[in-house]
Amino acid sequence: MKTLILLSALVLLAFQVQADPIQNTDEETKTEEQPGEEDQAVSVSFGDPEGTSLQEESLRDLVCYCRARGCKGRERMNGTCRKGHLLYMLCCR
């Protein structure tokens, strides 16, 4: 059941990212990727702030990063993340 809810949340996130129009502006196309920006730490939480049964130890230990060039080592791609108008891969371990 927890897996189903987690997968549903990731699917909804993917649909939301695809639904938002990506607008290319002159400034954006001129902007080069800055060094060090490919590894942005992301906090991932599920449920309400007071906690639910979803926030068990296995989910609290989930660490995710927004990466531009693919996941590293033991990480797996779990969707996408956005910084401004740029899309990155959401890599979690």
From Swiss-Prot:
The keyword Kinase does not apply. Disulfide bonds join C64-C92, C66-C81, C71-C91. Its main location: secreted. InterPro entries: Alpha-defensin, Alpha-defensin_C, Alpha-defensin_N, Beta/alpha-defensin_C. Residues 1-19 form the signal peptide. Residues 20-60 form a propeptide. The keyword Disulfide bond applies. Changing M89T: In strain: C3H/HeJ. Residues 23-54 are annotated as: Disordered. Pfam families: Defensin_1 (PF00323), Defensin_propep (PF00879). Keywords: Antibiotic, Antimicrobial, Defensin, Disulfide bond, Secreted, Signal. One of its GO terms (cellular component) is extracellular space. GO terms for biological process: cellular response to lipopolysaccharide; defense response to bacterium; defense response to Gram-negative bacterium; defense response to Gram-positive bacterium; response to xenobiotic stimulus. It comes from the Eukaryota. Paneth cells of the small bowel. Changing D61Y: In strain: C3H/HeJ. It is found in: Secreted. Belongs to the alpha-defensin family. Has broad-spectrum antimicrobial properties. Has antibacterial activity against the Gram-positive bacterium L.monocytogenes EGD and the Gram-negative bacteria E.coli ML-35p and avirulent S.typhimurium 7953, but not against the mouse-virulent S.typhimurium 14028S. Probably contributes to the antimicrobial barrier function of the small bowel mucosa. This is Alpha-defensin 6/12. It comes from Mus musculus. The gene is Defa6.
